[in-house]
């Protein structure tokens, strides 16, 4: 399904019959679990079967999954939709003795794509039936009698048996899913795939059209979920092994089958929001100092370099490509954990999880790609990062991609070097002296590694290694910042002309020829000539 990003959820829809799977009938068999109804008989299931199903799906022409929902569901507003809750006594596995339960999301509002959901027990899958009696319709104005018996579900969420109200992972809308770590606060999302993101044309949003939930053993800490994905360009089979914990781990295997050549395929896409922060206050009219789910893109390259790229809310769509081979990991991180920097006691941005992508095997040549989209609205996800293979996927291929996703306060891997803790920018020049020309100041703070010891050593010779793609730099320095037990690098950048062409910046600290910090990358758009101050 191709569409403008801002209209994704409002236009995402699917018809059950389009896949060729059996539609839900008006009758259903009695449930074995409390309150649940099932359809047909259990059928043998494993990941190999699901890959075969995706392969056959890709051989056939794509059929639209668009389906019009009943009028009352189409008319729901946000508050009405939020009031619809799945009943606890109907939760999947509620009658068992395992650690986990699953509950289902109702269709409506933005969520127009019915998905088949199956329960896997002892290697056999059986479809779960939509049942209006399983939902409390709250203040929605709906009742089960108004809705068809074959409506279907929008997605699902996972809970622990000890905490049935707070979910630790949810799959809802297109191929979106998300999870939380020990902070229990949702933030950024992941996707099954990103297709043609940031190309300038319509983006394609694949849909998970079926989920298969495997009943965990009683003593298991892991829930295994399978997903069948479909879109005009590709079909795919996914296996998620989800282990709940302080850092939630998703071990993912995917098998992808293109229908046609894909211009830009995004593997392991992370989707986030950045409106305003310390380094970019272009949209600083809000009363809160900072508004973002994440504040930077971290990368651990195949060559071993650690890179930090602060995020921005640019004046126009910005696309960056970081060429690599066999990357060791990348992700969108929320490094700033200070409540005082956000002052939001409703959504708690300081608790939002980082998301780290770790390939399980060599991914070959390609690039980590970053798309930043202008936004004035914190409800609009305007940041996307993903891996793009150098070779464009071709019809008839099988692409096997395995990776792990880590959701939590910190990623599982971090540089042995010092890391960037803050980036600030503003008007350059020397205080008390008349400016003869326009310049822009950058102050980059580093902490960790050897910096605490070096900051105490008066003989230490720490220098800033700085490169810019255009313009000139001046007033370059690196000095101890005792409050952070680290160092602050500072410099002014003078644009070469009055234009607004972007300037790429690269910076790290070193001593005695040895790097002390990760590499800080930045892309700055100079102010228009009419906005510059001397």
UniProtKB/Swiss-Prot annotation:
Subcellular location, principal: periplasm
Keyword Signal: yes
Keywords assigned by UniProt, alphabetized: Periplasm, Signal
Matching InterPro entries: Gal_mutarotase_sf_dom (IPR011013), GH-type_carb-bd (IPR014718), Glucan_biosyn_MdoD (IPR023724), Glucan_biosyn_MdoG/MdoD (IPR014438), Glucan_biosyn_MdoG_C (IPR007444), Ig-like_fold (IPR013783), Ig_E-set (IPR014756), TAT_signal (IPR006311)
Subcellular location: Periplasm
A GO BP annotation: beta-glucan biosynthetic process
Tree of life domain: Bacteria
PTM section of the record: Predicted to be exported by the Tat system. The position of the signal peptide cleavage has not been experimentally proven.
Pfam families with a match to the protein in the record: MdoG
Pathway annotation: Glycan metabolism; osmoregulated periplasmic glucan (OPG) biosynthesis
Gene3D superfamilies xref list: 2.70.98.10, Immunoglobulins
Disulfide bonds: none
SUPFAM superfamilies: E set domains, Galactose mutarotase-like
Signal peptide: 1-30
A Gene Ontology term for the protein's cellular component: outer membrane-bounded periplasmic space
Recorded GO MF terms: carbohydrate binding; catalytic activity
The keyword Signal belongs to this UniProt entry's keyword annotation: yes
Role summary: Probably involved in the control of the structural glucose backbone of osmoregulated periplasmic glucans (OPGs).
PANTHER family cross-referenced by the UniProt entry: GLUCANS BIOSYNTHESIS PROTEIN, GLUCANS BIOSYNTHESIS PROTEIN D
Family: Belongs to the OpgD/OpgG family.
Protein name: Glucans biosynthesis protein D
Taxonomic placement: Bacteria, Pseudomonadati, Pseudomonadota, Gammaproteobacteria, Lysobacterales
């Amino acid at each position: 399904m191709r569409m403008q990003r801002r209209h994704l959820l409002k236009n995402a829809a699917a018809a059950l019959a389009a896949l060729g799977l059996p539609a839900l009938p008006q009758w259903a068999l009695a449930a074995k679990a409390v309150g649940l109804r099932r359809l047909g008989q259990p059928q043998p299931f494993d990941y190999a079967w699901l890959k075969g199903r995706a392969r056959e799906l890709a051989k056939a022409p794509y059929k639209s999954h668009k389906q019009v929902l009943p009028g009352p569901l189409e008319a729901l507003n946000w508050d009405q939709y939020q009031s619809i809750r799945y009943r606890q006594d109907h939760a999947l596995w509620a009658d068992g003795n395992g650690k986990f339960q699953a509950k289902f999301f109702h269709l409506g509002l933005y969520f127009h794509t019915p998905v088949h959901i199956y329960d896997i027990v002892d290697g056999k899958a059986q479809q779960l039936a939509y049942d209006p009696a399983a939902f409390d319709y709250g203040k929605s104005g709906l009742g089960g009698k108004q809705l068809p018996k074959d409506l279907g579900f929008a997605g699902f969420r996972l809970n622990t048996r000890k905490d049935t109200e707070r979910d630790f992972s949810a799959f809802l809308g297109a191929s979106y899913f998300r999870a939380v770590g020990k902070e229990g606060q949702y933030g950024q999302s992941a996707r099954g795939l990103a297709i043609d993101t940031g190309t300038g044309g319509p983006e394609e949003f694949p849909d998970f059209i079926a989920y298969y939930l495997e009943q965990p053993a009683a003593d298991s800490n892991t829930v295994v979920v399978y997903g069948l994905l479909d879109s005009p360009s590709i079909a795919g089979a996914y296996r998620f092994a989800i282990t709940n914990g302080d850092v939630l781990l998703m071990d993912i295997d995917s098998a992808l089958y293109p229908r046609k050549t894909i211009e830009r395929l995004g593997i392991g896409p992370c989707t986030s929001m950045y409106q305003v922060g310390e380094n970019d206050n272009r949209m600083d009219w809000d009363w809160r100092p900072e508004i973002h789910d994440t504040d930077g893109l971290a990368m651990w390259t195949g060559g071993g370099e650690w890179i930090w790229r602060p995020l921005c809310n640019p004046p126009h769509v910005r696309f960056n490509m970081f060429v690599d081979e066999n990357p060791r990991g990348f992700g969108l991180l929320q490094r700033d954990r200070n409540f005082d920097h956000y002052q939001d006691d409703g959504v708690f941005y300081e608790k939002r999880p980082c998301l780290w992508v770790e390939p399980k095997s060599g991914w070959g040549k390609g690039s980590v790609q970053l798309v930043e989209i202008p936004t004035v609205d914190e409800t609009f996800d305007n940041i996307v990062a993903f891996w793009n293979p150098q070779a464009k996927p071709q019809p008839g291929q099988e692409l096997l991609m395995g990776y792990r996703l880590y959701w939590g306060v910190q990623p599982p891997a971090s540089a042995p070097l010092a890391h960037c803790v803050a980036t600030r920018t503003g008007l350059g020049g020397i205080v008390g002296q008349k400016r003869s020309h326009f310049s822009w100041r950058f102050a980059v703070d580093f902490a960790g590694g050897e910096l605490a010891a070096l900051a105490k050593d008066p003989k230490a010779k720490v220098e800033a290694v700085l490169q810019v793609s255009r313009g000139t730099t001046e007033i370059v320095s690196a000095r101890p910042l005792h409050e952070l037990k680290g160092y602050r690098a500072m410099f002014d950048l003078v644009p070469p002309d009055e234009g607004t062409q972007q300037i790429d910046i690269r910076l790290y600290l070193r001593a005695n020829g040895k790097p002390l910090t990760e590499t800080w990358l930045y892309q700055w758009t100079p102010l228009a000539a009419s906005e510059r101050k001397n």
